[in-house]
Amino acid sequence: DFQKGESFLQLSKTERDMIDLVTNNFKKVTLIYNGANTFQFDFLKDYPQIKSVVWCPPAGQTGFSALGEVLAGKTNPSGKTSDTFVKDLSQTPTANNFGSFMYDNVKEFVQHSSFGNNDVSPSFVNYSEGIYVGYKFYETASDEGLIDYDDTVQYPFGYGLSYTSFDQKMGDVKYDAKSGKISFDVTVTNTGDKSGKDVVEVYYNPPYTNGGIEKATANLVDFKKTKELKPGESQTVKVEFDDDDM
């Protein structure tokens, strides 16, 4: 059901035919992706009828009941992407390093798996990107001018929409040299007309010395989710982490 060179993280012919059928009959379409891995959504540009995408990872027996509440507007979504969605998966470090790489000197560690009724030997993967795994690769490559971010990334790490809007204001940063704690407040205000929750994401960009230790330009160090805020309501979130975390 796939063309040569395509993967199961792209549209199959059956899936594309289904999308063609729906978009040919409706002007406003919401696409629901029920999968655990990042999918290649480059096809969205071909379907202006698709107005929104909901990522609903496998959520067990009751997950789709919750999804129904989100689609109906009863529950305001507040989740954020836990990985980077790119426009061409074949160009990712993951795709180019993927394979079955087996050790040839660990026979004593081979174990039988009842799941596949076969023997499983220890394997490994070469991470050619080093520490720049996931979002760190794309954020750093963009900052260094190695990629065009908008041409490469479809949905960034930590991205997510809501039925309302929020404003975040960061307070002064405090540092306790004795405990090594870094702290500050972030005031989140619901500026829309629907109740909802927001997520405060804190990243740091360490100084880099040419020829020194490799460092990504974006590193998630902490995140906090607010309570459900009514329109116009605010909440001050306290952020605190150790300097060793950087």
Each PLM stretch: what is its role?
Residues 1-26, 31-48:
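Hydrophobic helix-and-loop "lid/oligomerization" segment in the mid-to-C-terminal part
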Residues 3-7, 49-57, 117-120, 214-228:
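Short beta-alpha connecting loops at secondary-structure transitions
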Residues 188-192, 206-208, 243-245:
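Beta-strand elements of well-folded, non-transmembrane domains
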Residues 211-246:
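Intrinsically disordered, low-complexity Pro/Gly/Ser/Thr-rich segments with frequent PxxP/GP/PP motifs
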